[in-house]
Amino acid sequence: MVLVNGKTINLMKFKIVPIKGDASFRIFYRIILNNKTKIIVLSQKEKYKNLVAYSAINNFLNKNKILAPKLYSHNYKKGMIVIEDFGNLSFYNILSKRKNKFQIYKQLVDLLVKIQKIKPKRKVKNFFGKSHIIRNYSTQQLHKESDLFFDWYLPLIVKKKKSNIIKKKTKKILSSLYKRLNLPNSIFVHRDFHVQNLMKIRSKIGVIDSQDALI
């Protein structure tokens, strides 16, 4: 038995199915009861901060008419939230079976444009009033993102000695380019907008994995 939002729930009545997640420290389960489903999200790291961001940014998107999972209940101290289930049909699945992909990609690009037209808000609240501050995009953040290439991909295609040389030269060039950037910090950036994070929900497009958004 567990207590959720003041109600005692018998977990023995639920069917719980693990869901293959993304490359993160979150674990996902689908709970099924009377043919209705919800998603449990467990965070193994930065429990409170990570899950408040997850639900607060989803709430912000919903308020701006972008479909994102709603929060049903939470236990931030134990690193758990229960959210709306958008199913298994991602646009990755849809596109892999379609020959003519243009119209689908157009829909997705139109959605991206709509997201980037949202008036950004620094402080956002989740469905229960908990606050999250959306951070600015910075040159430091850009370096972190480009480092993923050096840490994960480059070692797979070249030997270590050569990899270190390429890394040093490329980082120097990137550093020079990043210094020239003028980051206005005036646009909402999802940062994980790709077909596996875009779900088909009847005639609509649902957006997931929005917790790392920046301005």
Q: How does the language model describe each region?
A:
Residues 16-20, 45, 137, 190:
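Glycine-rich loop motifs involved in handling phospho/adenylate chemistry
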Residues 29-144, 182:
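ATP-binding pocket architecture of kinase catalytic cores
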Residues 120-122, 132-135, 140-141, 145-188:
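An alpha-helical support segment within catalytic cores of ATP-dependent transferases
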Residues 11-32:
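ATP-binding glycine-rich phosphate-binding loop
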